[in-house]
């Protein structure tokens, strides 16, 4: 079956590689991917799979299934330009909250496609490990269980994909864990110790669940792969962009410098502000996200973490 992956960043290429084991994959990106795809295609060909082919948007739209791996902040614009069929089968693999309209991913998508045609990819994984074929378990959330299973059955042998409902819980967990991961990086960067880190992450999980429950997210989603699993991975690894943002802030570097050195998108930065604004609107208690927002605006890192440990 033909699958189109939209987005040529590290995550998009990793997903193209993963789906390429069992399927014919087309990838659509503004950048030239000839060199980045070479090693991935060599690996696919060695397994008897077809190589990933970079094509233009119109060719990509002829695929049967669509996987979207672009920044959440550009997702609405992408949907507007792509003009997908209303019943297009879409798996969104982007984690975050749109800052401009304070909208969740599913809220953006429903303006352009049938909600029953939408899936959301969640769970603990890094692009760098997927392209090595290392094992992981992910969750495909959808209100349409049959569609979630269809996507799950297209994943490679090294990925265990579960099909679950609760799309709102899955996308909130995927967005919120990036926020807590920044705080986790700060905690480690300041060498506050394992006890403080454990307290931060456990309270962060509670905060994530509280926020998600307000919008109908289920407890089991936040305690499973989509929530706890992704949080513990992202908040503890140097492979995580958001964790590295926290490490940089712990060195008293201005946020602008940290992001410039990172050279990649860290969704948690903008997601933090979106969460705080949403929480303020609905009266949801989010002490970690609120304190982190102050840190991102320039509050002293030591003062911020001291306040955070006491409040969280």
From Swiss-Prot:
Pathway this chain belongs to: Membrane lipid metabolism; glycerophospholipid metabolism
Binding site for sn-glycerol 3-phosphate: 95, 123, 125, 177, 230, 240-242
Keyword Cell inner membrane annotated: no
GO cellular component: cytosol
Ranges in a coiled coil: none
Enzymatic reactions: sn-glycerol 3-phosphate + NAD(+) = dihydroxyacetone phosphate + NADH + H(+); sn-glycerol 3-phosphate + NADP(+) = dihydroxyacetone phosphate + NADPH + H(+)
Pfam family, one: NAD_Gly3P_dh_N
Keywords associated with the record: Cytoplasm, Lipid biosynthesis, Lipid metabolism, NAD, NADP, Nucleotide-binding, Oxidoreductase, Phospholipid biosynthesis, Phospholipid metabolism
Known EC number: 1.1.1.94
GO molecular function, one term: NAD binding
Gene Ontology biological process terms in this record: carbohydrate metabolic process; glycerol-3-phosphate biosynthetic process; glycerol-3-phosphate catabolic process; glycerophospholipid metabolic process; phospholipid biosynthetic process
Main location: cytoplasm
Compartment(s) where it occurs, according to its Swiss-Prot or TrEMBL record: Cytoplasm
SUPFAM superfamilies membership: 6-phosphogluconate dehydrogenase C-terminal domain-like (SSF48179), NAD(P)-binding Rossmann-fold domains (SSF51735)
Role according to the record: Catalyzes the reduction of the glycolytic intermediate dihydroxyacetone phosphate (DHAP) to sn-glycerol 3-phosphate (G3P), the key precursor for phospholipid synthesis.
Protein name as it appears in the record: Glycerol-3-phosphate dehydrogenase [NAD(P)+]
Lineage, broadest ranks: Bacteria, Pseudomonadati, Campylobacterota, Epsilonproteobacteria, Campylobacterales
């Amino acid at each position: 079956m033909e699958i189109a992956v939209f987005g040529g960043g590290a995550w998009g290429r990793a997903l193209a590689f993963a789906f390429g084991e069992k399927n014919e994959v087309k990838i659509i990106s503004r950048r030239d991917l000839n060199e980045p795809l070479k090693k991935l295609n060599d690996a696919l060909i060695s397994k008897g799979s077809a190589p990933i082919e970079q094509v233009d948007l119109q060719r990509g739209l002829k695929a049967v299934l669509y996987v979207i791996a672009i920044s959440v902040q550009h997702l609405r614009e992408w949907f507007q330009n792509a003009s997908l069929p209303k019943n297009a089968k879409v798996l969104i693999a982007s984690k975050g909250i749109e800052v401009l309209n304070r909208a969740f991913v599913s809220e953006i998508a429903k303006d352009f496609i049938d909600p029953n045609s939408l899936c959301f990819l969640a769970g603990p994984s890094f692009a760098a490990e997927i392209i090595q074929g290392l094992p992981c378990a992910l969750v495909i959330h959808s209100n349409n269980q049959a569609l979630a299973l269809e996507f799950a059955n297209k994943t490679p042998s090294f990925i265990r994909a579960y099909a679950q409902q609760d799309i709102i819980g899955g996308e909130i967990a995927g967005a919120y864990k990036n926020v807590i991961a920044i705080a986790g990086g700060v905690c480690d960067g300041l060498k506050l110790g394992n006890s403080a880190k454990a307290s931060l992450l456990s309270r962060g999980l509670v905060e994530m669940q509280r926020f998600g429950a307000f919008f109908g997210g289920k407890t089991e989603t936040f305690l499973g792969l989509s929530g706890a699993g992704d949080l513990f991975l992202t908040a503890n690894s140097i492979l995580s962009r958001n964790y590295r943002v926290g490490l940089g802030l712990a060195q008293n570097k201005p946020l602008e410098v940290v992001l410039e050195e990172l050279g990649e998108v860290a969704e948690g930065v903008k997601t933090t502000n979106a969460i705080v604004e949403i929480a303020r609107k609905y009266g949801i208690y989010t002490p970690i996200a609120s304190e982190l927002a102050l840190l991102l605006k320039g509050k002293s890192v030591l003062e911020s973490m001291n306040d955070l440990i006491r409040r969280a």
